[in-house]
Regions:
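Acidic, serine/threonine-rich low-complexity disordered tracts
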Residues: 12-93, 99-118, 172-262
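Bacterial N-terminal signal peptides
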Residues: 1-4
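Solvent-exposed helix/loop surface patches that form functional interfaces
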Residues: 36-38, 122-202
Length: 262
């Protein structure tokens, strides 16, 4: 998962009474787009409870812009440089268009493609996923409606910054999260857990937990260390990450700590 950067993909008009800060998807060619910065972001992934031992993986996010389209490459590598997992993301203006997951450790591949519509209620997400990448092209699509504040991991950081005032005042903020291996979105809620200092910086600790009790049994709560001063960057993230860990000859989901190099 490795949550780093976030904002919603939806029409630019929120429902009446909504607190959502929806970003306009109609941007000029010279406007700064939400997901184009930083051009390069790196991080290190450690075992839970230790950020000083041997790293498990290295993370690198690279963003390039062509007109109003942003292409993002997210790579997860072993310390020796070998790729463990790769994600590709495409945004048009500030809206998600395409998300692709290559789980190179287990040979799986999946995608989520957004079909926008002038009628926001008719926008859709099309999912494909195969445990065998060689059979990916023959997998059947699974489709669900695109709801407001639907995110992928790359969109979480900006999403939290956009809802900073609510979170800082103790309000809960909800989202739908795209999980390609499940070919669906899952509801999550963010809330402030505490305020503290992190390496001399004033920070908030935010907790992200599934809205469903069923999903809560499968995924532990996730935690974000976010600087209190603008631009409210995610400094550290603890929870489910994209690469897996080999244990007794089997690949298992990995909960880990990711420290970002801001």
């Amino acid at each position: 998962m490795c949550l780093v950067t976030g904002r919603a993909v939806a029409e630019p008009t929120a429902p009446a009474g909504s607190h959502s800060k929806v970003l306009s998807t109609n941007c000029s060619a010279t406007a700064n787009l939400t997901y184009e910065n930083p051009p390069v972001l790196t991080g290190t992934i450690y075992r839970m409870g230790s950020t000083s031992g041997q790293p498990l993986f290295k993370f690198k996010r690279t963003a390039t812009r062509s007109g109003n389209r942003i292409h993002v490459l997210r790579e997860f590598s072993y310390p020796d440089g070998k790729l463990a997992a790769r994600e590709r993301v495409v945004y048009q203006d500030n809206a998600l268009v395409h998300y692709e997951l290559d789980e190179l450790q287990i040979g799986a591949r999946g995608t989520a493609d957004v079909e926008q519509s002038a009628n926001r209620n008719k926008a859709k997400i099309h999912f494909h996923y195969s445990k065998d990448a060689s059979t990916y092209s023959s997998t059947a699509a699974k489709t669900e409606p695109l709801l407001l504040d639907t995110l992928i991991n790359d969109m979480v950081g900006p999403f939290l910054a956009a809802h900073w005032d609510q979170l800082a005042h103790g309000e809960k903020v909800g989202c739908r999260f795209i999980i390609v291996p499940r070919r669906e979105t899952v509801g999550f809620t963010f809330r402030k857990e505490s305020e503290t200092q992190w390496h001399g910086r004033d920070v908030l600790i935010l907790r992200m937990e599934p809205s469903s009790m069923l999903i809560s049994a499968l995924v532990n709560s996730l935690h974000f260390v976010i600087e209190k001063n603008p631009p409210h960057r995610v400094l550290e993230y603890s929870g489910r990450t994209t690469p897996k860990l080999s244990s007794s000859g089997h690949w298992t989901d990995l909960d880990a700590v990711t420290v970002f190099d801001w």
